[in-house]
Amino acid sequence: MADAPIAVVTGAAQGIGLACAEALNEDGYKVILVDVQDSVHKAAADLGGVGMICDMGDVDAIGALFDTIEAEHGPVSALVNNAGIAMPGSFLDYDLDAFDRVMNINLRGVFVAMQRAAATMVEKGIEGAIVNMSSINAQVAIPAIPAYCASKGGVMQLTKVAALALAKNNIRVNAVGPGSIDTEMMAGVNANPEAFKMAMSRTPLGRSGTAREVGDVVAFLCSKKASYVTGETIYIDGGRLGLNYVMS
């Protein structure tokens, strides 16, 4: 895969990010898996990719990350901004440091990574693809995670802005918005029968999605099959956003 295009996936040590990396690897990309956790190295080795450590809330670290990738592997053709956190808390006394931390990773980090990847794409004439991880919580709110909901709404709008700004360079920018996906973030819901029943009552397909189902949509958006798709957020939610009543 010496001449394979380079794809970078953040938050790739597990869950949705790892599934995105797997799908892109199958599509012929050389995948750089990025995470703040050391376990990203094993995940990358198992996949035949490259693991790198980066805190996506640290602007300087993001710059250094892309410097290293470009120097050691070449310019990036596809970027998947998946890294994100959710820090719960009461709206009335939500900690501002927590708010800033969520925004720095979930929104500012996405912006900075897009800027850096896109600048090189423009310079090298690469007609690349960027996919950002939004959420159904860009559209529907959960009071206990105010910063997360706000950040994912921001990602949705920032995706549109970037898509319009980069269209003249044939760089496509899209987002995906997962619903209830069977990952570690949903482990608490899955372990609680009542909570799981409530989540499924709002999901017409009646089941959780899999991380790979998200990864496959991301890979599609990075592919030439989606060559006329830009500025969109595709919701992978089992029909949840279209529902205006509770399923029995």
Describe the residue ranges of each PLM region.
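Short, small/polar-rich loop/turn modules that mediate ligand/substrate recognition or access, typified
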Residues: V80, A167, R172, V229-G231
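Substrate-binding pocket helix/loop in short-chain dehydrogenase/reductase
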Residues: S90-F91, A98-D100, A199
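Active-site loop immediately N-terminal to the catalytic Tyr-X3-Lys motif
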Residues: L92, V140-P146, K168-N169, G206, ...
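Active-site helix of classical SDR
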Residues: M114, S151, T159
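Alpha-helical segment proximal to the catalytic Tyr-Lys
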Residues: A119, L164-K168, S227
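Residue(s) in the substrate-gating loop at a strand-loop-helix junction
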Residues: S135
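Short C-terminal tail/terminal secondary-structure segment
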Residues: A219, T230-S248
